[in-house]
Swiss-Prot record:
Membrane topology: Multi-pass membrane protein
Main location: membrane
Record organism: Arabidopsis thaliana (Mouse-ear cress)
Protein known as: High affinity nitrate transporter 2.6
PANTHER family attached to this UniProt entry: HIGH-AFFINITY NITRATE TRANSPORTER 2.3
Positions of modified residues (Phosphothreonine): 533
Keyword Phosphoprotein included in the entry's annotation: yes
Observed phenotype of the null mutant: Loss of plant growth and root system architecture responses to the rhizospheric Phyllobacterium.
Renumbered residue ranges of the record's region Disordered: 516-542
Domain of life: Eukaryota
Tissue: Expressed in roots and shoots. Expressed in leaves.
Length: 542
């Protein structure tokens, strides 16, 4: 049925296609007003999308309460999958006081298992980056969920320290879903809001580390009420996260979509998307020095957070003589802060970019990461329970916001190797966690309190390299963009990832579109300077 459009129906950008603008919505938008005279045409290729999109068909509006396909559905499938994997990976942490008595674990055994739980994901996240670039985020997410589910079920059958460590190592592989989650949102949403979207997806997924601190003791208690002994109840409790992973894997395969225009394999067969070579994707990821700085930065933001998920419950339980339930609630509040802290970091990055460009994003990243690390030092030195809780909450907000701000920068490092760079950055988080747990929490050399303070000092020092991240087209914290007319263009930076032969085949066109949509990273002042001055100096009078 045809509809008559009028001015009162709303203009493009204020409503969905074919829907009036009268509905109340909750959204974050960067779309500029478009004159109402520009009517929607039936041959508009973007008309099939529920949200306004850019030239790459990436959404320019973020509506967290919507499940519209493909953009918002990919967002929700991505973060819930990651959330589920976080629950599984850290499900053992709040039950350690019971598990250690059942398996006769020493402090060293517990520390090594904590390292193992995050070490496996170093390799799986690297692999996931390549999988996303070559096969798409949908397959990567689903395979990670379903292939690691048997390991979660296996936790019910461990009999000694060795099997406990091995199973936690294998479960940790599922944390690779973080990479597919961030990749998925990066290809679905435009750069102007990518900090907020990635912050919400990553933060809400990380929240699983807090939820599991409440969920697993609760499930354990419920199973005990049925008549099971404590040493049996904790084993049955692991069936819950295992089942959740299988369910999410099926949902991702059946409901998900790789890219705004369809699944990657379908688009490659039709010739709409070129099939890339792994060697090329790998080379442009590892040779970019910015990748390795992000690797280190994430190692001491997300890495610190992963370490805290493994030690914080036991720290409050032992240091302040709390019950298992009370220690779990306090520990959960650390992870639950992700609900707003990480999105705040991403949003702050987006706002800084609108005002100051990429340089603003880098400053926000350094400030948040340094502040979070300082509060980590304070947490280790806190001598009373209220002060320790306050320090922990401030520390969690700073560190988690830094994670959000970092993934406001990461999508701009490379267009061709986006997945692999996301994988390397994510692997940095697990590497940093493994290092900090090995150095400070896996032996009797330091108390847990001393380990927390030393970890904070290390995080402060490792936040300094952000000053060396320089984009020729946008500059860095202290240096301006390149004065070279050619190098100062976004098209030159992203086009350099393609050979002349590849360009002649048109394989670089996606990167050029991305470059055009990334000009907002110049900042408001630079954008205004690029607007040509009208030939007539006086405005028309109306």
């Amino acid at each position: 049925m045809a509809h008559n459009h009028s001015n009162e129906d709303g203009s493009i950008g204020t409503s969905l296609h074919g829907v009036t603008a009268r509905e109340q919505v909750f959204s974050f938008s960067v779309q500029e007003d478009v004159p109402s005279s520009q009517a929607v045409r039936t041959n508009d290729p973007t008309a099939k999308f529920a949200l306004p999109v850019d030239s790459e068909h990436r959404a320019k509006v973020f509506k967290p309460l919507s499940f519209a396909k493909p953009h918002m559905r990919a967002f929700h499938l991505g973060w819930i999958s990651f959330f589920t994997c976080f629950i599984s990976t850290f499900a053992a942490a709040p039950l350690v006081p019971v598990i250690r008595d059942n398996l006769d674990l020493t402090k060293t055994d517990i520390g090594n298992a904590g390292v193992a739980s995050v070490s496996g994901a170093i390799f799986s996240r690297l692999a996931m980056g390549a999988v996303c670039d070559l096969l798409g985020a949908r397959y990567g997410t689903a395979f990670s969920l379903m292939l690691t589910a048997p390991a979660v079920f296996s936790m019910s059958f461990v009999a000694d320290a060795g099997s406990y460590l091995a199973v936690r190592f294998m479960i940790g592989f599922c944390l690779a879903t973080f990479v597919s989650c961030q990749y998925w949102t990066s290809v679905m949403f435009t750069g102007k809001i990518i900090g907020l979207v990635n912050g919400c997806a990553g933060g809400w997924g990380d929240m699983g580390g807090g939820v599991t601190q409440l969920l697993m003791p609760m499930v354990f208690h419920v199973i005990k009420l049925t008549g099971a002994t404590p040493f049996t109840a904790w084993r049955f409790a692991f069936f819950i996260p295992g089942i959740l992973q299988i369910v999410m894997g099926i949902l991702v395969l059946t409901l998900g979509q790789d890219l705004p225009d369809g699944n990657l394999s379908t688009l490659q067969k039709s010739g709409q998307v070129s099939k890339d070579k792994f060697s090329k994707v790998f080379w442009f990821a590892v040779k970019n020095y910015r990748t390795w700085i992000l690797f280190m930065l994430y190692g001491f933001s997300m890495g610190v957070e992963l370490t805290i998920n493994n030690v914080i419950s036991g720290y409050f339980y032992d240091r302040f003589n709390l019950t298992l339930h009370t220690a779990g609630i306090i520990a959960a509040s650390f992870g639950m802060a992700n609900f707003f802290a990480r999105p705040f970091g991403g949003y702050a990055s987006d706002v800084a970019a609108r005002l100051f460009g990429m340089r603003g994003r880098l400053w926000i990243l350094w400030i948040l990461q340094t502040v979070g690390a300082l509060f980590c030092i304070w947490l280790g030195r806190a001598s009373s329970l209220p002060i320790a809780i306050l320090a922990m909450m401030l520390f969690s907000m700073g560190t988690q916001a830094a994670c959000g701000a970092l993934f406001g920068v990461a999508p701009f490092v490379s267009r061709r190797s986006l997945g692999l760079i996301s994988g390397l950055t994510g692997a940095g988080g697990n590497f940093g966690s493994g290092v900090t747990q090995l150095l400070f929490f896996s032996s009797s050399r330091f108390s847990t309190a001393e380990g927390l303070s030393l970890m904070g000092v290390m995080a402060v020092v490792c936040s300094l390299p952000v000053a060396f991240i320089h984009f020729p087209q946008w500059g860095s914290m202290f240096l301006r963009p390149s004065q070279d007319g050619e190098k100062s263009k976004e098209e030159h930076y992203y086009g350099a990832e393609w050979t002349e032969e590849e360009k002649s085949l048109g394989l670089h066109e996606g990167s050029i579109k991305f470059a055009e949509n990334s000009r907002s990273e110049r900042g408001r002042k630079a954008m205004l300077a690029d607007i040509p001055t009208p030939e007539t100096g006086s405005p028309a009078h109306v």
